[in-house]
Amino acid sequence: MKKVLYVDCCIRGEESRTKKIADAFFANLCDQYEVKHLDLKNENLKPLVNDFFDEREKLIAEHNLTHPRFRYAHELADVDMVVIAAPFYDLSFPSLLKIYIENCTVDGITFASTSTGLKGLCKATNMYYFTSRGGFYHNAADEQATPYLKHLCNFLGIDHFDYIDADGMDVVD
C-alpha cells in the first residue's frame, strides 16, 4: 500500500479551516493509502541553533544518518505522497512548519550534494499544500508560502506540486 505523510501545522486543531480542507481531501484517500498523520504542534521540534545545529552537522559529517534525530527526514524521504496543511501567517505559514522543514532537509537522506549540483532523494512524486487565508492573496507577490513549498519540492526531487488555497475567509463586504 502506498504511503502518505500528512504534515499538519494547523495550530487551531479541529477548529482550523485549513484542517477541514485537508480532512476533506483525506476522506477520499482512506482506502488507497496508509496515512501517517504528523501533528506538528504535538512534536518536540527544535530549531537548528547552537548545540542542536552543531550535533546535526557532526552526525552528517560522520555519515551517521541512522541517528534518531533524523527521523523526520527518513519519514519524508520514504513516502509516496506528501500533504502539508498550514494556515497563512505573516505572508507565509507558521514558523513551526519551517522548523520541521529544517529538520527534514538532510544531505544524504532527502537530498544529495553531487559533483553536478544538488539532487533530490525523496521517493514521493506529489506534494499537496492546503491553506486558508483571511484576505485575498492567491498568486499575490506578498504570498511567500506557496512559491517556497514549490521550490522545496524541486529541491527534494518531488516532481509534482499542487495547492488549494481558500482565500478571503475573513473578508466582510
Residue ranges and their predicted role:
Residues M1-A86, L91-E102, V106:
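N-terminal beta1-alpha1-beta2 submodule of the flavodoxin-like/Rossmannoid cofactor-binding fold
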Residues V82, M127-Y128:
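Short, well-ordered beta-strand core segments
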Residues C104-K119:
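Short, acidic/small-residue loops that bind anionic groups at enzyme active sites
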Residues L118-A124, L156:
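Short, conserved loop/helix-junction motifs that constitute active-site signature segments
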Residues H138-D173:
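Glycine-rich phosphate/pyrophosphate-binding loop and the adjoining helix
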